[in-house]
Structures are given as C-alpha cells and as structure tokens.
Amino acid sequence: MASPRWAALARDTNETKVKLALSIDGGDLPPDTHPSLLEAAASGHASQSSSSQKISINTGIGFLDHMLHAFAKHAGFSLLLTCQGDLHIDDHHTAEDVCIALGDAFKTALGSAAGIARFGFAYCPLDEALSRAVVDVSNRPFAVVELGLRREKIGDLSCEMIPHCIMSFATAARLTIHVDCIRGENDHHRAESAFKALAVAVRTAVGKVAGREGEVPSTKGTLSV
C-alpha cells in the first residue's frame, strides 16, 4: 500500500501566521493536523466536506479563499488552511505567504517524483473566459503567468497579487508553471478559470502511472537535484 502523500505545517513570521494540512490525493488529512484547523473547518467558510475531500480555507481575503477553494477542489486535494495576517497594511504578505506555505506543503507531501506522470496540462472555461495551464514537476521552479486582468482588485484581493500567488506557489513547490488566460471579459472569470486549469494540470502531473512504479520520469535519472 502506497504511503499517504500528505503534510501539515505552520509558517509563522512577524507578518503572518499560516497553518495548513494537505493531502494531495484527497480523503483523510494527516494525523498531526493542528486542532485549530479542524475547528475552523466546522465554520463552513469556503469549505466543503465529503468522503473524497475535506476543504476549508480562511485567509481573511475572501477572493483568495475562493481561488484556493477552487484550486483544491479541482486538484483533488484535501486542504485545511488558515492565516492571520497583517491585513491592516495590505493583502501582499497574506496572499504571498499563504501560497508559499501551500507550495512548501505540496513539496513535502509529494516526496519522491518516482512513478508520477510529471507533466500535466489543462484548458478550463468559465463562461466566456478560457485559461490554459501547463505544469512540470521538474524541481526547477519557474512561472510564467499572463492573465490579462484589468481591474485593480477583485473583492479584497489586488489583481497584481493573483499572478504573484501562482508564482509564489511554483517557487515553493519547485514546479515549472505556465498559465495564461486566452480570452475573457470578466476578470473574476479570467482568474477563476486560470486557477481551475492549474488545478487540473497539477492533478494530472502528480498522478501515478501504472507500470512505472519507482521509475523517475527524467533522462537524468533524478528530479531531486
């Protein structure tokens, strides 16, 4: 039986305090999940629970919660996440640190890349908006994000932070990510279709490939260095 791909962590700085628990394959969460996360999950904020997934997000930024909820849902993750941040300054530290913490947890939970597909891509629409995402579990952190957002903010999240969130996740998770919104008139739709496309691409990339158990998907023979 394969080991669970999960991780729980706390990331504390003078600017933010992030707690999260992640299971890449959904289902149950790690046994060391912080009790406060389980309590927060009962609040119903940006959350849903089923036998296959448990999701609850509360960063203090509603639109960021919405994007991370969509990302976790369509990636097939179970994810509990809370953040107490210095929102009296602005949204930058909270949005950035949450995505760094999520990337750190993802990298820890994934462990070895042996046996996975490594590459994933997806197109996802939301009404008139269409986005494309391509992911490589490469251990070579890089991101190109072109969403063409025109508004200053969506809800309480600065539009300049939306690509920065994806870049922060890519850096911490050590993924190569390309995401672009091909068309769309509504910035909410453009952003959400991008997060959904990224989620489906990640889900494909980390999927196990039958018959390639233990095989590293690289001509180098390793994705660790």
From Swiss-Prot:
SUPFAM superfamilies: Ribosomal protein S5 domain 2-like
Pathway: Amino-acid biosynthesis; L-histidine biosynthesis; L-histidine from 5-phospho-alpha-D-ribose 1-diphosphate: step 6/9
The keyword Endoplasmic reticulum is assigned to this record: no
MF-aspect GO terms: imidazoleglycerol-phosphate dehydratase activity
Species: Pyricularia oryzae (strain 70-15 / ATCC MYA-4617 / FGSC 8958)
Designated name of the protein: Imidazoleglycerol-phosphate dehydratase
Reactions catalysed according to its record: D-erythro-1-(imidazol-4-yl)glycerol 3-phosphate = 3-(imidazol-4-yl)-2-oxopropyl phosphate + H2O
Keywords: Amino-acid biosynthesis, Histidine biosynthesis, Lyase
Coiled coil: none
Annotated EC: 4.2.1.19
GO BP, one annotated term: L-histidine biosynthetic process
Family classification: Belongs to the imidazoleglycerol-phosphate dehydratase family.
CDD domains assigned to the protein according to its UniProt record, in alphabetical order: IGPD (cd07914)
Keyword Cytoplasm: no
Top-rank taxon: Eukaryota
